[in-house]
Amino acid sequence: MQTLHVELGERRYPIFIGSQLDPEQLLEPYIHGQQVMIVSNVTVAPLYLSHYQEALESLGKTVATCILPDGEKYKDIQHLNLIFDALLEVGFNRDCTVLALGGGVIGDMAGFASACFQRGVYFVQVPTTLLSQVDSSVGGKTGINHPLGKNMLGAFQQPQVVLADMAQLNTLPERELSAGLAEVIKYALLGDEDFLVWLEENMDGLVARDADLLAEAVYRSCAHKARIVANDEKEQGERALLNLGHTFGHAIESYLGYGTWLHGEAVATGMVMAADLSQRLGWISNEDVARTKKIIQRANLPISCPQIPLDDFLGYMAHDKKVLNGQLRLVLLKQLGQAVITKDFDVELMKQAILANQHG
C-alpha cells in the first residue's frame, strides 16, 4: 500500500492506494461520530456495499444506506434530495459521516450533500472507478449539474480520507477504465513529460489492468493533483490547469446529453482540440499533436466528436466556470508537459480546432 497526503494545514488528509485494502483498519481513525450514511449506486452496491457496511458496523457504527441510480444524467437536484431525505429519515446529526462508495457521480453528489446537510458534516471518499480515483475524489470539488451547464451547483468539501482500491477496478467496464485513463493522460500532458513517456511505455499494461501499473498510475496522478490542490485549493490560479480539455469536453457532454459520452471520453477529445489549437497558435508541433492523439487512441478513447453546430458548441463554452469578466480562458499547451491558462488566443483558430476534430 502507498500513502499520499493532501497538505491543507489542519485539514490535511491521506489517500491510501493499494489492492484489497482493509476498510475497518484504514477508516477507524477518520470516522469521528457514530453515524455513517453510505451513498452508492445500483451498480456498485451489489459488489462492495456489504464489505464496507460490515467493516463499519464492526467498529460499532450505526450505518444507513442511500442507493441511487447509476449515471451522469442522475447528477441533479432531484437525486441530491434523495440523500437529504435518507439522512433526515434516519435522524442523523451533525456528527455523522457521509461515505461515497462509487465513481465520480456518487462522489460529487455525496460530497455536496455532506457540505450542505446541517451546514456541513464529515465526508469520506471510496472511489471505485479509475476516473474517480485519479481525479474527482481528490481535492474537494463536489457538485451537481444544471440543465444549462455541468457542475454549476456545488461546494468545496474536502474528505477526511480517500481509499483507492485497485481490486475494485477489476469489475470496471472497459469503457469506464478508458475514461479514467483520459484523466491520467491529462496529468502527463499538463505537467510531466516524463510521466507521458512512462504512459507510452506502459499503456498496453494499463489497458490490460495490470494492478501494479494501475497503482503506479493512480499514485503519480494523485501526487500531481495533491500538489496543485495544496497550492490552490479554491481554483484561483494553478488549479485551473487541471481543466485541460474540459472546456471543450463539457461542451461535448452538454450537447450530446449527460451520459451519452462518458466524462473521460469527452475530455479525451477536448484535449485533442486543445492540442490542435496550441499547434495553430505555433506553441507545439504537428508531431506533438500526433503524439497526443496516439496515446489517447491507445487508451481506446475518441479523438473526435460527432458534428455539433458551432454556435451550440460556443454557447456551451460560454457557460464555462473559467469565463472571467466575460472572457473565455482556455488551458492550452506551451509544450507537452507544460500547460498554461490563457485568454490570449485567436477565436477563429479556436473555431477551426473545434471543427477539425469532429466527424460526420
From Swiss-Prot:
Keywords: Amino-acid biosynthesis, Aromatic amino acid biosynthesis, Cobalt, Cytoplasm, Lyase, Metal-binding, NAD, Nucleotide-binding, Zinc. It holds the Pfam family DHQS_C. Zn(2+) binds at residues 183, 246, 263. Its EC number is 4.2.3.4. It is found in: Cytoplasm. GO terms for biological process: amino acid biosynthetic process; aromatic amino acid family biosynthetic process; chorismate biosynthetic process. NAD(+) binds at residues 70-75, 104-108, 128-129, 141, 150. It catalyses: 7-phospho-2-dehydro-3-deoxy-D-arabino-heptonate = 3-dehydroquinate + phosphate. Its cofactor is Co(2+); Zn(2+); NAD(+). Transmembrane segments: none annotated. InterPro entries: Dehydroquinate_synthase (IPR050071), DHQ_synth_AroB (IPR016037), DHQ_synth_fam (IPR030963), DHQS/DOIS_N (IPR030960), DHQS_C (IPR056179). Signal peptide: none annotated. Catalyzes the conversion of 3-deoxy-D-arabino-heptulosonate 7-phosphate (DAHP) to dehydroquinate (DHQ). This is 3-dehydroquinate synthase. The gene is aroB.
